[in-house]
Regions:
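Beta-lactam-recognizing serine transpeptidase/beta-lactamase-like catalytic domain environment
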Residues: 1-40, 45-176
């Protein structure tokens, strides 16, 4: 097992070499270096983007039908896998219940300027990127240890609003 005493004062070279080849990566800082999709934690960003651009208000209600059919791959709300939908839901309730369907529709509205234009990935993504940047999610945290750069999604706004698509962040970047 890992013993930091063997690395204090003088370094046991053989031990250090074994740590570097250990498949469990005991020297790898997962909190700052491993990037992953943020998932539902990103829904706060999507809420801010939707509210500030006016595609939703605090009282806007969206009917969760389980399967989102406005785009071709028809993503599903997680609740449907448990035999129900969230029904008519507003942004506060959608955050509380982590309703994917609601945020799919926010992404769609961002990509269509609230249904006034045809669907355009670039339009939706640029708005998501703008608000993620305003919230500091386009930069590292500044802690004084090695940290991977964050990646804001650059495709699929409907999926990006639930923290999927190609969003990628280190845990520390989401925790600030």
């Amino acid at each position: 097992g890992y013993d930091n005493n063997r690395l204090a004062n003088t370094v046991d070279a053989d031990y250090f070499a074994s740590l570097n080849t250990d498949l469990s990566k005991p020297l790898y800082n997962y909190a700052t270096q491993e990037r992953t999709a943020p998932g539902s934690t990103f829904k706060m960003v999507s809420s801010v983007a939707g509210l500030d651009t006016g595609v939703i208000t605090l009282t806007t209600q969206i009917m969760d039908k389980g399967v989102y059919e406005n785009i071709s791959n028809h993503p599903r709300c997680w609740a449907l896998n448990h035999g129900y939908t969230h029904g008519l839901i507003n942004v506060s309730e959608a955050l509380r219940d982590s309703c994917n369907y609601f945020f799919y529709d926010v992404g769609y509205r961002l990509a269509t300027n609230n249904f006034s234009t045809s669907y355009d990935d670039a339009t939706g993504i640029s708005k998501i990127q703008e608000y993620a940047s305003l919230l500091g999610l386009d930069e590292t945290t500044g802690v004084e240890i090695e940290e991977n750069d964050p990646q804001i999604a650059d495709e699929y706004p409907v999926m990006a609003t639930i923290g999927q698509s190609n969003n990628n962040y280190a845990t520390i970047q989401l925790g600030r």
